[in-house]
């Protein structure tokens, strides 16, 4: 039934999703040119509010849970599992007051309405996976911006999306690089549940009626912890919560 209804409602979802990303491309441009980065960020937040709401057109339920008061006056590294591209709009919207940035493939900075503009000018890191020196340099620049502005970054240490929802081993690289420049960053694990089911049939049809959730897990400090311990604590916490 999820697949059958998906055939009916997926075109409606894509129509509205596409409308909003096209609408907000010139809005982002105007906000950035006239109001600078802060105005641009507000336009991106609003875009992702609308994108998240297009999920409801497929009968989805979306929940975000955070029982922990997170600081806004220091950098945060959100460490999350990754199940689909649909993970990202809710993260941008629900974490908006923490100025969450992302590490993205440089190829995405061209040709995608709204998305490419935000990746270019939103303050994240755009890396060439074939050029490790460029990738490290970009992440270090991001870490410097985090430290200077008390921004946060969302890291997907699995390195790729999980097609079946099962957790893949965590890699150290991105988190270790950020901590070199922002050693005072707080580590905050996030568990994402069931967004993989949304795309279990591929891009078409999307699955109807899935219950997706994003939950903040217990934060912890990096002091007196090795990188292996930091990643192990995060991986185990997310694994238990899945």
Task: Provide a role label for each language-model segment.
Residues 58-65, 136, 197:
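Short gly/ser/thr-rich secondary-structure transition/capping motifs
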Residues 21, 25-29, 33, 40-43, ...:
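Catalytic core of membrane glycerolipid acyltransferases/transacylases, capturing the structured
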Residues 1-63, 117-118:
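A transmembrane-helix-recognition feature enriched in membrane-embedded lipid enzymes
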Residues 114-116, 154, 163-228:
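A cross-family acyltransferase "interaction/gating" segment
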Residues 135, 142-143, 158-163:
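Soluble extracytoplasmic domains of inner/organellar membrane proteins
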Residues 64, 125-128, 222:
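Short acidic-hydrophobic, aromatic-tinged amphipathic segments that line or gate anion-handling sites
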């Amino acid at each position: 039934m999820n697949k059958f209804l998906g055939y009916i409602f997926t075109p409606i979802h894509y129509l509205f999703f596409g409308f909003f990303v096209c609408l907000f491309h010139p809005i982002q441009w105007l906000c950035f040119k006239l109001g600078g980065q802060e105005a641009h960020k507000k336009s991106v937040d609003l875009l992702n509010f609308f994108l998240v709401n297009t999920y409801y057109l497929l009968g989805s339920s979306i929940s975000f849970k955070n029982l922990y008061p997170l600081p806004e006056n220091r950098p945060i590294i959100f460490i999350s599992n990754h199940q689909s591209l649909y993970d990202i709009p809710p993260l941008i919207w629900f974490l908006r007051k923490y100025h969450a940035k992302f590490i993205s493939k440089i190829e995405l900075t061209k040709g995608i309405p709204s998305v490419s503009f935000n990746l270019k000018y939103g303050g994240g890191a755009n890396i060439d996976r074939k050029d490790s020196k460029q990738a490290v340099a970009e992440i270090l620049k991001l870490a410097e911006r985090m430290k200077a502005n008390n921004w946060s970054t969302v890291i997907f240490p699995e390195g790729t999306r999980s097609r079946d929802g099962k957790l893949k081993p965590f890699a150290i690289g991105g988190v270790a690089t950020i901590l070199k420049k922002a050693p005072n960053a707080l580590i905050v694990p996030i568990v994402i549940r069931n967004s993989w089911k949304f795309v279990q049939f591929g891009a078409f049809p999307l699955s109807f009626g899935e219950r997706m959730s994003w939950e903040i897990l217990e934060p912890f400090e990096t002091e007196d912890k090795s990188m292996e311990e930091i990643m192990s604590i995060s991986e185990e916490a997310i694994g238990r919560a899945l």
